[in-house]
């Protein structure tokens, strides 16, 4: 695995104030600019001899509407003693990828300065304006060196942005570097079968293991409708036979920053819809960060459509049983008006337009 940012942190002068920051999930917000740190990719250069670093992969973003659904904005802080912290983001951490070099925090009360020390150098992280984008990036040069660690929760939530709407619901693929629990009303599935024409999915529990791409039936069109609870650990196990692959980054910073991107090839299919039905379809360009996709054979259709065949939640019911069911096996109350979509009625597939 490539080094995530052997960042940063070189120094020399010891700072006296002890940082009191509990282990947990945070977003890191600059107190001067109001921008949040977002990790676009893990490409960072460090020159230990001079103490200079290139932190261009760590961009700063103003809009909470952007960061609320961007896993690159979520950091798990774990104290290592002596004001040192390991910072976990996406699929790795600073400490595990930098030979044990950890950043330190200098407490100012409600905010902190993030610094490091190496071979006589002390470097503070600063938020520097980017004139080209109107946003910013993290650097060890600059004056905006005070940061607020905002705990994840409440208004500072993590929500999933839909990719498509189909069969009467909003849907998204999603992969997190941390285990998480679905919000009420959401359901997760993994793809357990793929043919040239269709795919089948199987329902999972509400706790999803880390680093597992899944397909999620959402509550609504906004990330605020689709909140999840992040966890440092979980007893949930990875499903056997998951056919999905996942992405971590979709950096647009150019050069080697884009080495970790996944570009759509002819065999790849990303989540979409076909004729109102849930499908994996041909895509183009770079697949978005923290999403899932499947691979298809050279003879496969452009749109591989969801099929009721092989869905565990439906297989558990006798197809001759009377009643109306959704494609995920949920029985619709008798007399309820059906939204447009595909249903199983008395064992037969029906389409409501």
Language-model regions: role of each:
Residues 21, 148-182, 205-311, 353:
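A short, polar beta-strand/turn micro-motif
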Residues 15, 308-353:
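C-terminal outer-membrane/trafficking sorting elements
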Residues 20-49, 63-131, 140-156:
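Extracellular glycan-recognition/adhesion modules and their associated mucin-like linkers
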Residues 29-34, 41, 81, 89-93, ...:
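Short, flexible beta-strand-to-coil junctions
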Residues 9-18:
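Hydrophobic h-region of N-terminal signal peptides that target proteins for export
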Residues 1-4, 353:
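Positively charged n-region of N-terminal signal peptides that target proteins for export
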Residues 54, 59-61, 65-67, 72, ...:
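Self-processing/autoproteolytic domain segments and adjacent N-terminal interaction modules in large
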